[in-house]
A protein has these predicted regions:
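Hydrophobic pocket-lining residues within nucleotide cofactor-binding pockets
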Residues: 15, 50, 123
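Single conserved hydrophobic/aromatic residue that forms the stacking wall/gate
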Residues: 120, 125-128
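N-terminal cap/lid subdomain of alpha/beta-hydrolase-fold enzymes
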Residues: 31, 41-112
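A short alpha->loop->secondary-structure connector
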Residues: 115-118
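Catalytic-loop region of hydrolases
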Residues: 1-43, 55, 59-60
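Residues that form or immediately flank small-molecule/cofactor binding pockets and catalytic motifs
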Residues: 14-15, 101, 128
Length: 128
């Protein structure tokens, strides 16, 4: 049975770093699987490795995810063998959330993001 997934983004207007600096308009990409119970007591939060993505289980295509840098490893979720119907983390029983880390390259604010307001962090134009 195909794993049903839903990829979304959560927006944070201002995110304060430990250094005191503020990041503005932070986007956090995440994917959910299953259904949250009425009591909200069946949620499981799974974090990926530093080089992973929020694409935990199921199948994905570049056409459905045009905003992220694509590679073949993204076509099948990195924990597809463990998350899904009748698997170790059964999505008919649990509501699973996997978010991409801040600074990641797969849809969350990171090195691929355009930060117009942070021009003081960019290099000046160099004429030949």
């Amino acid at each position: 049975m195909k794993v049903q997934n839903k990829t979304s983004k959560f927006y944070i207007p201002q995110f304060k770093l430990d250094s005191g600096e503020l990041l503005e308009n932070v986007e956090i990409a995440y994917t959910t699987y299953g259904t949250l119970s009425e009591k909200g007591d069946n949620a499981v939060l799974i974090f990926h490795a530093l080089t992973g993505s929020h694409m935990l289980a199921g199948n994905y295509s570049q056409e459905e995810n045009p905003e992220i840098p694509w590679n073949d490893e993204l076509e099948i979720g990195w924990w597809d063998e463990f998350v899904g119907v009748n698997k170790l983390i059964d999505t008919e029983k649990y509501f699973v959330v996997c978010a991409n880390y801040l600074g990641g390259c797969y849809g969350t604010t990171g090195p691929n993001s355009i930060a117009v307001s942070y021009t003081h962090l960019t290099l000046p134009t160099i004429d030949p």
